[in-house]
């Protein structure tokens, strides 16, 4: 690692053909440095990196920096890793594992136990936790542990967000933990999808969606609407740490967040999502019939495990109608069946999106301040309002987003600065603004269910949302 005339050597802990894990030495210069690997006397290319005094990273089960964290319940001699079955209770002491609290006196000797001289804050479900220890672990070089007590006001749930802030301003990645007031296996009353995914098996999931969009291109705002549908038929492994951003959702009243290296335009593209065991063949034909007619969903993949289609758009595209869904009307999703999944049908009712009443004020969002979303006219059948944001920074090769769930009856929700910390700022001079925020509603507690030979469970959801491009500052 080099900065001008100063060069220090990182401390390798693992070296493989395609990966090197190393500890940044405590005497590394702060600021912009170049990193170069030398092997058998041959130096590779230099890559830029930014070194700061403290920047904590929570270690997660999937190794990707999101989802269930490596957090131990300090309850028994075994110190079970927190999971949807081994939950924590409010007031219980937890041990959180990570790296990046800051430098120590010497890197080449066993770590000294003791708090490191940096301000550390832990937030569980948005609530501040009592800190008991924050320093090096005595087990390993470069590994830090933070001992904290679960706040009394922390919400119960299977994917309660956990965030660490150091030095008063540097926010970690967001991990999750499972909390139950009685230490029983966790439940998510507002979201049945997570339990289905954890149970695993042969699953069918359909999403019918209406969205109203506003997009800024070269300073001009374009508005359009779109109706779409998608169905996936897959065998999932499940498990107590299974995590998928689309179904492993935070408790109502909280937010989870994602920040990763790379340009990933949607949550489904994030690395670290559990791999599907098997794609299931549902046959050649899946269709959707409503008041506006019948549309076919195109197959994707081999075997055809995913069926998707743009049903309508106001953009006047050739061969695609202007609208498909009618609020309050039923739509029949039907499949003829195939080698793995038999014939099925499901009836789903369309509904309008909430009215996002302060959308104009969200055209620019200051990440350090957070922002409040207000709405009216949430659909009567919805049990959650979902607020999602995402942004990419191609120049710095980073992506980040957040998702919050709110009570539809509340009419407002404040997305905290902690949830926005890992959303990259919008680069100046972009012709097309790539950041966006969506405000929508759905019924996740009691979705429509359907059955078919070869499926353990099938669910169908109608979601409606308003989405607009946003400049994140």
Annotate each predicted stretch with a short phrase.
Residues 1-278, 368-374, 379-395, 400, ...:
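A sequence-level detector for low-complexity, Ser/Thr- and acidic-rich stretches
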Residues 5-15, 128-138, 283-285, 289-313, ...:
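Solvent-exposed serine/threonine-rich low-complexity stretches and specific carbohydrate-binding patches
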Residues 16-18, 142, 302-303, 350-352, ...:
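Ser/Thr- and Asn-enriched, surface-exposed coil loops between beta-strands
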Residues 19-26, 145-151, 311-320, 410-422:
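Exposed aromatic-hydrophobic patches
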Residues 249-256, 263-295, 300-305, 363, ...:
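Exposed regions on extracellular, virion, or secretory-pathway luminal proteins
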Residues 293-372, 377-379:
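Surface-exposed loop/turn and intrinsically disordered segments
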Residues 391, 396-428:
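Active-site/pore-lining binding-face segments in mid-to-C-terminal subdomains
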Residues 454-458:
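Protein-protein interaction regions
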């Amino acid at each position: 690692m080099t900065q001008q005339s100063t060069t220090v050597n990182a401390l390798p802990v693992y070296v493989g053909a395609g990966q090197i894990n190393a500890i940044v030495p405590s005497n590394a210069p702060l600021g912009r440095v170049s990193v170069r690997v030398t092997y058998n006397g041959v130096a590779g290319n230099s890559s830029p990196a930014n070194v700061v005094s403290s920047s904590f990273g929570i270690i997660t089960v999937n190794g990707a920096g999101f989802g269930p964290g490596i957090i131990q319940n300090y309850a028994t001699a075994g110190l079970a890793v927190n999971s949807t079955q081994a939950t924590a209770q409010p007031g219980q002491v937890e041990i959180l594992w990570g790296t990046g609290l800051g430098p120590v006196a010497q890197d080449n000797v066993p770590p000294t136990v003791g708090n490191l001289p940096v301000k550390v804050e832990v937030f569980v479900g948005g609530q501040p936790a009592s800190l008991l220890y924050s320093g090096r672990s005595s087990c390993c070089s470069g590994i830090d542990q933070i001992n904290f007590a679960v706040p009394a006001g922390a919400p119960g749930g299977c994917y309660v967000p956990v965030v660490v802030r150091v030095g008063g301003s540097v926010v970690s990645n967001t991990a999750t933990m499972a909390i139950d007031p009685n230490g029983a296996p966790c439940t998510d009353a507002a979201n049945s999808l997570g339990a289905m995914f954890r149970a695993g098996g042969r699953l069918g999931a359909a999403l019918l969606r209406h969205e109203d969009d506003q997009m800024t291109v070269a300073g001009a705002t374009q508005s359009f609407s779109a109706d779409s549908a998608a169905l996936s038929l897959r065998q999932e492994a499940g498990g107590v740490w299974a995590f998928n951003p689309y179904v492993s959702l935070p408790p109502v009243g909280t937010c989870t967040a994602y920040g990763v290296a790379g340009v990933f335009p949607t949550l489904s593209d994030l690395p670290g999502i559990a791999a599907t065991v098997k794609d299931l063949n549902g046959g050649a034909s899946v269709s959707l019939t409503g008041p506006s007619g019948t549309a076919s969903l195109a197959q994707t993949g081999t075997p055809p495990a995913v069926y998707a289609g743009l049903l309508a758009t106001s953009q006047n595209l050739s061969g695609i109608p202007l609208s498909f869904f009618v609020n309050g009307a039923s739509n029949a999703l039907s499949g003829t069946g195939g080698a793995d999944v038999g014939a099925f049908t499901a009836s789903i009712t369309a509904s309008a999106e909430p009215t996002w009443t302060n959308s104009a004020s969200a055209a620019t969002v200051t990440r350090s301040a957070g922002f409040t979303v207000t709405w009216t006219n949430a659909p009567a059948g919805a049990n959650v309002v979902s607020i999602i944001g995402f942004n990419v920074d191609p120049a710095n090769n980073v992506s980040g987003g957040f998702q919050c769930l709110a009570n539809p009856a509340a009419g407002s929700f404040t997305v905290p600065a902690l949830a926005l910390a890992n959303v990259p700022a919008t680069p100046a001079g972009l012709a097309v603004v790539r950041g966006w925020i969506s405000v929508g509603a759905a019924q996740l507690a009691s979705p429509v269910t359907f059955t078919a030979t070869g499926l353990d469970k099938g669910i169908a959801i109608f979601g409606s949302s308003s989405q607009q491009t946003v400049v994140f500052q």
